[in-house]
């Protein structure tokens, strides 16, 4: 099962028949994907599917063995890798960490314009109250937002996020999804990877299901089907509806008995 999006605008990113290997072991094969202005695309798939590798190929940090990644001229790309808790030995404040995006030096003397830009970005991500805190004192979720703020300081046209909701609580996850929707409305394109099907993927407008190659790509409602999920994850899954929301479970027998009576498989619903 494959599906590619059709755009009326010139894409910012055009991935054509991409292949990436580690030695003789293929990581990605025959990947074709386009990203248009204002796109918000989630990449889902099992561990080892190549999600991070695809982001790195788009960011230009690895060289593919086959195919190509074409970027529009003068495209500004922000890339935030998956963040583990930072334990830096040197004392760096949140303000200084974000400022690195403009100065490329840890303790450079900022201009008034740069100070204003940092303050604006920190406020947008609700980090202004933490500006003078050492980054190593923050939680993992707070640190993740700091690195997103640093990427936004460069005013990217395309933002690449690797597992941005990993290790964050429900409230921070909702805040991040709201921020991504705002960035999209501002015209920024966002591509992110996630393992969280129910908490993140179901809330995104577009999904690409990846397992070494793209199994399917398109509107979330058309991609999140039991057939495509099984091809992607190699396991039987059900897509259920509850209270107007889509829920994905491994299999019906794993569903709580009381909950099972209150949900309807979307496949059956669509056949009525």
What spans do the regions from the language model cover?
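Conserved ABC ATPase signature
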Residues: 134-138, 142
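Catalytic Walker B motif of ABC-type/P-loop ATPase nucleotide-binding domains
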Residues: 159-163
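Helix-to-loop junction immediately C-terminal to a conserved catalytic motif
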Residues: 59
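Conserved ABC ATPase "signature" region
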Residues: 99, 112-130
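H-loop/switch region of ABC-family ATPase nucleotide-binding domains
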Residues: 194-195
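ABC ATPase nucleotide-binding domains
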Residues: 226, 231-272
């Amino acid at each position: 099962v494959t599906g590619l999006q059709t755009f009326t605008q010139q894409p910012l990113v055009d991935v054509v028949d991409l292949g990436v290997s580690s030695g003789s072991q293929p990581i990605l094969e025959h990947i074709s994907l386009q990203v248009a202005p204002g796109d918000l695309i989630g990449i889902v798939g099992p561990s080892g599917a190549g999600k991070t590798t695809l982001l790195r190929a788009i960011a230009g940090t690895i060289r593919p063995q086959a195919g190509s990644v074409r970027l529009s001229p003068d495209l500004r790309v922000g890339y935030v890798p998956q963040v583990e808790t930072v334990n830096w030995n040197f004392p760096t404040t949140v303000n200084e960490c974000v400022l690195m995006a403009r100065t490329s030096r840890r303790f450079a003397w900022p201009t008034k314009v740069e100070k204003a830009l940092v303050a604006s970005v920190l406020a947008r991500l609700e980090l202004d109250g933490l500006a003078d805190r050492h980054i190593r004192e923050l939680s993992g979720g707070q640190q993740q937002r700091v690195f997103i703020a640093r990427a936004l300081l460069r005013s990217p046209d395309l933002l690449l996020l690797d597992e941005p909701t990993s290790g964050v609580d429900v409230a921070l996850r909702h805040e991040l999804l709201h921020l991504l929707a705002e960035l999209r409305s501002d015209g920024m394109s966002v591509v992110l990877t996630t393992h969280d099907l129910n908490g993140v993927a179901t809330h995104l407008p577009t999904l690409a299901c990846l397992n070494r190659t793209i199994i399917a790509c398109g509107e979330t409602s058309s991609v999140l089907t039991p057939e495509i999920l099984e091809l992607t994850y190699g396991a039987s899954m059900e897509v259920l509806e509850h209270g107007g929301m889509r829920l994905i479970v491994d299999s019906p027998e794993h569903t709580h008995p009381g909950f099972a009576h209150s949900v309807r498989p979307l496949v059956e619903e669509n056949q009525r």
